[in-house]
């Protein structure tokens, strides 16, 4: 779906994304790094942050080990411990 967007719609809009990498590249990297569900979630959150009043700038995909939340085998999202007792 991302590749279709990049092939069909992206040439009409040009390079207008306020962030680097672009929203479609960010979503593709997020899906490759975190899988379809969490990577897709990160991509949607990024698209919601990308608007005309956003400051923009460099916004890399978070690394796999740096998440504050994790998904259980049953699909529930739970907070990870931050090493505090």
Curated annotation (Swiss-Prot):
Where in the cell?
Cell membrane
Q: Which GO terms describe its cellular component?
A: plasma membrane
What is the scientific name of the source organism? Leifsonia xyli subsp. xyli (strain CTCB07)
- Cite the entry's keywords alphabetically: Cell membrane, Membrane
The family annotation for this protein states:
Belongs to the UPF0161 family.
UniProt cross-references to InterPro entries, sorted A to Z: Membr_insert_effic_factor_YidD
In what way does this protein cross or attach to the membrane? Peripheral membrane protein
What protein name applies here? Putative membrane protein insertion efficiency factor
Coarsely, its chief localization is: membrane
On the tree of life, the source organism's domain of life is Bacteria
Q: What is this protein's function per UniProt?
A: Could be involved in insertion of integral membrane proteins into the membrane.
**Is Ribosomal protein among the key words of this record?**
no
State if DNA damage is listed as a keyword: no
